[in-house]
């Protein structure tokens, strides 16, 4: 029913759940028993419905994730899918942790500010750095000279 309700959005099997705005496709990864995690599918569909495509500042990612989880709760109700709000909050917490970790100065460990598109500056020691994407890999921070 979900797929037929959104004919302009493609759904394809992938190695994880994510929305690809360039392909207009929701990718999903069936579980070992072949079933689909409907909550994650609806969450990624929510990104599609909300036209989420990119973000300029890291804090914007947290904002669009919050929007997507709010939409997930709305859609899940319409499709009679139970969303464990603790798990949804845990997912948002993981983005908050991601944001915090990116803002830690690689020189003095103080919290820096994102001053430009994915460029941080430490208010304590003046170091500037760019973190890698690190949403699904290990975080690295590269000092800017």
Where are these predicted regions, by residue range?
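Pan-zinc metallopeptidase signature
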Residues: 79-89, 93-145
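N-terminal accessory/interface modules of nucleic-acid-binding and processing proteins
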Residues: 3-13, 50, 58, 75-82, ...
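Catalytic Zn2+-binding segment of zinc metalloproteases
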Residues: 45-62
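Post-HExxH zinc-binding segment in Zn-dependent metallohydrolases
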Residues: 60-88
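Short N-terminal micro-motifs specific to bacterial/archaeal maturation
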Residues: 29-32, 59, 113
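Alpha-helical scaffolds flanking conserved acidic
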Residues: 35-40, 86
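Active-site scaffold of zinc-dependent metalloenzymes
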Residues: 1-37, 48, 52
């Amino acid at each position: 029913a979900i797929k037929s309700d959104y004919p302009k959005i493609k759904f394809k099997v992938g190695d994880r759940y994510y929305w690809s705005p360039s392909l207009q496709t929701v990718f999903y990864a069936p579980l070992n028993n072949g079933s689909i995690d409907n909550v994650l599918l609806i969450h990624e569909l929510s990104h599609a419905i909300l036209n989420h495509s990119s973000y300029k500042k890291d804090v914007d990612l947290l904002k669009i994730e919050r929007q997507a989880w709010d939409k997930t709760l709305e859609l899940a109700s319409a499709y009679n899918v139970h969303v464990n709000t603790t798990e949804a909050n845990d997912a948002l917490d993981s983005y908050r942790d991601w944001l915090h970790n990116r803002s830690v100065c690689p020189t003095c460990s103080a919290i820096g500010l994102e001053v430009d598109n994915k460029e941080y500056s430490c208010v304590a020691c003046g170091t500037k750095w760019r973190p890698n994407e690190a949403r699904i890999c290990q975080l690295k921070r590269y000092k800017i000279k």
